From Swiss-Prot:
Location of this chain's protein in the cell: Cell membrane
Topological domains, Cytoplasmic: 1-8, 72-97, 161-180
TM helices/strands, residue ranges: 9-29, 51-71, 98-118, 140-160
GO CC aspect terms: plasma membrane
Record keywords: Cell membrane, Membrane, Transmembrane, Transmembrane helix
Protein's name according to its UniProt entry: CASP-like protein 2C1
Length: 180
């Protein structure tokens, strides 16, 4: 069971890294140039919207974190590590939770900004940007789908981390470690 769970966690982490990198690349490399007025060109990039910049930073950080944990897993699987497994399990569980929530929050904030770009807001006199930059908006939508898929993968990873932490505690006594 432990070997199967370890393989599953590695597969989930690799999948999450790939989807997170795909999300960051889709957002960061997405540009579209349109002629706005006779000879004036406007270029839409991810730098035009702070939510898109934050999404790129958060997804890159989450991918890096998952890559570090893959390295930790490969080092610990080769050597017989006799450290505080409980402490490391709690740290990994907490960081997994933070990574999931940050990725989900960045995707949701970007989704809110994307809705404003699609529909505009007459009260704030914001124009519908996606009428002019359709391809840009479609690619950002694809990136958001990838981002939410990555959030779901990382939530599954977090459940495995939770299992690793709480299996060490006694089912009969509240927060008491199992006796060896």
């Amino acid at each position: 069971m432990k070997l199967g769970m370890a393989r599953g966690e590695v597969c989930l982490r690799v999948s999450a890294i790939l989807v997170l990198v795909l999300t960051a690349c889709l957002v960061a490399l997405d540009t579209q140039t349109k002629v706005v007025f006779v000879s004036i060109e406007k270029k839409a990039t991810y730098k035009d919207l702070n939510a898109l910049k934050i999404l790129v930073y958060v997804t890159c950080a989450a991918a890096g974190y998952n890559l570090l944990l893959l390295c930790k897993h490969s080092i610990w699987s080769r050597k017989n590590f006799k450290g505080s497994y409980l402490c490391m399990a709690w740290i990994c569980f907490s960081l997994d939770q933070i990574a999931v929530y940050m990725t989900f929050a960045a995707n949701t904030a970007t989704m809110g900004a994307a809705v404003l770009a699609i529909s505009g807001s007459e009260a704030f006199q914001w124009l519908k940007v996606c009428d002019k930059f359709t391809r840009f908006c479609v690619e950002i939508g694809g990136a958001l789908l990838c981002g939410y898929a990555a959030s779901m993968l990382m939530a599954l990873i977090s459940t495995i981390s939770a299992y690793k932490v709480f299996r060490m505690y006694s089912p009969k006594w509240f927060l008491r470690l199992k006796s060896a």
